[in-house]
Structure formats: C-alpha cells, structure tokens
Amino acid sequence: MKKLILLMSALLLAACGGPSAPERGEGYDVAEQNYRELHHRLLVMDSHLDTPANLSNPDFDILADNPSKLGRVQVDLPKMERGGLDGGFWVIYTPQGPLNVTSYEAAKLAALKRSDEILQLIEMHPNEFELATTADDAERIAASGKKIVYKSIENSYPLGTDLGMIEEFYNRGVRLIGPVHFMDNQFADSATDLSASDLGGLTPLGEELIREANRLGMMIDASHAADSALEAIMEVSSTPVVLSHTGVSSLYDHPRNISDDLLRKVAADGGVIQINALGAYIEDLEPPAERVEAMQALSEEFSGISPFDLSSNERERYLARRQEINETYPMPLSSFDVFMDQMLHALAIVGPDHVGMGADWDGGGGVAGMEDVSDLPKVTERLLEEGYSKEDLEKIWGGNLLRIMRQAEAAKQN
C-alpha cells in the first residue's frame, strides 16, 4: 500500500529528473513526521538478514512482535512494518566443518534444509511474504504490500566440490552467493582465518565458482573474503561485487573491514559496500572476562566435533548454552553514531552509488539506538541531515543492489 505513492513519485522523477543533493541542513525538513513519511515511501532493503536462523525455533513467530533483546529477534513482520523494511536477502548460512566428502554432504543437507525453511515461511504466509528472483520483482512485491524475500548463500562450503550445486540453489531461488566465511575453505581465503596457509585469494575451484555464478546470473558476495580473495573475485567476475555486510578499516582496523583504497577499487568496478552494524567490527569493544571464560569453556567442550556430527539434543544444548552466555554476559554495544560514522565515511569515499545497508540483523548486528529493524528510519533522518537527497536514499536503501542484480541478469543473457 505504502509503495503506491512511491510508484507515482517514480513517474514524476522520470518526467522531471531527480532532485539534486541539498547542502547540509537544507532541502528537507527533517522533523520526525516528514523523515518518517519519506522513509516509508522508499524501497528499503537490507542485504544480509540472518533471520532464517530463527525459523526452526518453535518459539519464533514471524508475524508476532517478538522480544527484541539484542542477539535474539531483530526482524519480524511488526518490526519490519514499523521500520519501513520491505525485505532483502534472507541468508542460507552453514557453519564450516572439515574439508572432506562426508562433511560436505552433511553441510549440503543442512543448507538445503535452511533453503526449504525460507520457502515454507512464504508458503505459510503468502499474503505477507513473496519470493523474489529478479530485480524487477522487488518493486512489484513491495507495491503489493508484501515483504520481499531474496535468498542468499553465506559460505559456499556446502557445495563441496560439486559446482553443479550452484545451479541447484539457483533453481531454488538463490541470487547472491558468498564463497567463504570465517575459515578458509575449498574456494577462497577468509579475512578472519589467520591460522591457515595462504591460498592465494581464490583457488582454481573458487575461480570456477565465480564463473558459474556469472553464467547463471547470480551476484557475488565478497564479505568475509580476504583482501586477496576480493581482488581475485573482481578480476574473475564479469559483474560487480556486493559486500553484503562489511565496514571500513580506516575507522576501525578489523579483518572484516576493508581499506579506503580497496573500497575505491570496488566502486570503480561498479560494486557496493553494505555497511555492517556488528559492534565488535566497527569499534574496539572489550568483552567481559566472564564471557571470554564461558565461551572458551564451551568451545573446549565441543572441540574437534563437526557441527554436522552433533545430535539434535547436543545441538539444542549447545545453542541453549550460547544463549545463556549471551544473556548473562552480553557483549558491550557500539552506538548508532559509530555505525553512522562508518556509513558516512564510505559515502564520502565512494559516494551514494556504491553504499548501502547490510546490518547483519539476527546475526550479531545492531547497536545502541538501532537495536532492531524498527529503528531504520533513524538512518534516513541522519542522511537527510547530512544533505543527502531522496535520489541518494533510493540508491542507498536498495537501488544499488538492484542495479548490480540487473547487471548480473544481463551478463547471464549475454
């Protein structure tokens, strides 16, 4: 419903041209009613929603306003409505085990199960959610009043060495694929795996993965990739890369962030950085000593066990212990201002054509003042205060992602 106004605005912009960016403090009255009204007219997407991890939890109801304690439920339908979030990329995340055939098979089954859970969400709530597989789907679904569900893969480890599985996941709706996660794998070097030997960026199998994704029309997500892997991906890929949840290292030097020089290369290649809101990646936050001790004990208890070898009871026990630690010894939070510093710095370096939002909701993201997706209008308010235009906001909140998706679709056709 809200997007009917957006469609009319798009026609007017096409006839008259987009507005020029106002100077700071000019152009828009950012009184609460006005910035919220504008925000809810925009097509608002996030490129990294870890919410599918909650779908197997019997206590989770996507239609309910679930308790929003940080680290638990940050995305559900009421919060999306309040925050003007139209949807985005719902993540198929699979933890990594040993690099062997048995573990690959177990990981593949886990990833397929998660993919099916996303489809089941849509089947159970067809009036609220719809699967999107093309760039044009986003506007249509949002205009219908439903939430947009694109699928993405975080960590291609479950593919094993069978690249035919990329097409299998494509046929199941996946349109964004990340080769690697916290550890080096069969495809690429990870930004955070400091113990393993250097694979040289992409392995030969990793290069094949990128080419196959290009052939199918999938976008490439280089978040979690080492710098060498990111540069190799840009060299091999025929389409620009997406950094679905990443920060800038010039403000906080963390392996998950990238330098200004590398960010400029991503932008020159047509890519986009979607700014992460995971506090420990954007600010030096010291965890409580009790938390470190408890997490170490939990790690030692499950040391050497592949996550796919755990029984359902063991998995539930592990997750319950993790949740107990999170609630008893929570990590200190970063702040909304620190998050916005990250976004504004990226905008200053590469401009609004190459920056977006990928806060890592339900996967560790969220800061004080922006604890869940209901707080997203605050980002629009701040960007307006900084002088960014409605046209800029349209790009930042989803337009840049859809541009790259259209490029991927065109590359497939060619």
Model-derived regions, located:
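Sec-dependent signal peptide recognition
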Residues: 2-10
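Intrinsically disordered, low-complexity segments enriched in polar/charged small residues
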Residues: 7-8, 53, 250
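Short, linear, compositionally biased motifs with a strong N-terminal bias
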Residues: 10-11, 173
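C-terminal motif of bacterial Sec signal peptides marking the signal peptidase cleavage site
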Residues: 13-15
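N-terminal hydrophobic targeting/anchoring segments and the immediately downstream early-domain regions
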Residues: 17-199, 253-414
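Divalent metal-binding pocket/active-site signature
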Residues: 158-160, 171-256
